[in-house]
């Protein structure tokens, strides 16, 4: 089109207030966690769009708070209960609160488009396109010169990876794409032709036509904008600015911190409509829904066996070959790719280039290789200052130190019990949910995790791979070996805060502490007697059932307790391990020795 035929281009002053979406304090309280996360994403996306223009720009305090995972209410107030980003924005927010729209997404959409010019004929907002003057007024606003009008692409066109790098919308396109319904035909993975589940997965696809001008100086990876480069550089620097106030764990991104904090608050915003069960993550709800539909979407190409979880397919595929799992398509219904497009492309393009010279295993990163090599070298650079125990990873040391401090930041919402790590909390939760996905082929016993199943199967095979280097005794699992080795080293890291007594294992400390508290959580359903230890309850129940599982191999007599059988067998063997220190007389029972001591006490009062 000739220059003379073009429409007159209005000059538009663009400020942060124009792209800000604000809520009153009452509105903020009513937002669900998922809605607050959407609000953060929208505000940060709008701010990044302004920064990407390359002109000087003062970061608003509300953006700094959102990047740190804080609520946007710690900025100064103007008396109206609205975040003070300026009188202009406060006025807009007050005006926007008059809306009667009960839908959060409708509200945020209305606010996000309130200042965008509309094409009354097409009923679609414009995108401003043009160059910017390299100057700022006193208010920090930018002057857009020769702005041309261009319609926002419809959802149908948005899946064609339309390049929008030269366009800038004052209101984030992300809002509209999240609120408008998904298109019926899912986007395709260009490498395998596999379909993707969500439009957002296509939006995460690298912009193929964009000029990747920002390069990482360490690994030379390129990015299309500075914000992506800064996020990536944190992987090299180890910078973790976002710290959890509960457990002090640090994260490189605010979104990771927000997701982590749910483990402390116990918030479960995702609810199953079938059974009412709640989950902290949408992915956990998605996995749970398969238990109702009995859907098994992940199929092994080798043998045709199907699994309801992709992790189950990965574990199964190791039976066929100890190779890269990407050899087999972990996709849905045996053909379509279940990962996001960006994840799918990484799987196909990435190679395991870090080789271990000891065992030949390959790894995708040098840090993973370093962690692995400590298995061969025995290197444990992270040492506990309290007991001197060393660990190969810093995370293991942090978890261990909680034994000494007594800190248990992860708490069960059902019973209130605390745990030192999230993995132990997850194992404990299975007690309440009763979920058991792994069945033993020998005895049919159901177990809650694959690792527990492997340890259980060693009962049938007799395998004991964990061997003590001092005495040669073997164990089925490493935790039993570690506990046994403390007999040789004399290490007793678990200390009672009441009396100072120390123990080799945490369970012994827990049982001991009930002496001080008087707690007896194990109750017999038959007679109502309570016990401080579960083993005592098990032995007691045999009185009601009449069960005597311990049998003497010599005479066939049976006993309720193994200790009673051991004492009985001394009658046949003639063993008398208990000796009187006064007269040297031997006894086969400790109780007999105790009664014998009374004779000497009476003789020498």
Swiss-Prot record:
A zinc finger (C2H2-type) spans 214-236, 242-264, 270-292, 298-320, 354-376, 382-404, 410-432, 438-460, 464-488, 494-516, 522-544, 550-572, 578-600. It is found in: Nucleus. There is a cross-link at residues 110, 121, 139, 171, 268 (Glycyl lysine isopeptide (Lys-Gly) (interchain with G-Cter in SUMO2)). One of its GO terms (cellular component) is cytosol. Residues 74-106 are annotated as: Disordered. Keywords: Activator, DNA-binding, Isopeptide bond, Metal-binding, Nucleus, Repeat, Transcription, Transcription regulation, Ubl conjugation, Zinc, Zinc-finger. Its main location: nucleus. PROSITE patterns: KRAB, ZINC_FINGER_C2H2_1, ZINC_FINGER_C2H2_2. It holds the Pfam family zf-C2H2. One of its GO terms (molecular function) is zinc ion binding. GO terms for biological process: regulation of transcription by RNA polymerase II; sensory perception of sound. Residues 14-85 form the KRAB domain. The keyword Ubl conjugation applies. Gene3D superfamilies: 6.10.140.140, Classic Zinc Finger. The keyword Acyltransferase does not apply. Expressed in kidney and inner ear. Residues 95-105 have a biased composition (Low complexity). Belongs to the krueppel C2H2-type zinc-finger protein family. This is Zinc finger protein 354A. It comes from Homo sapiens.
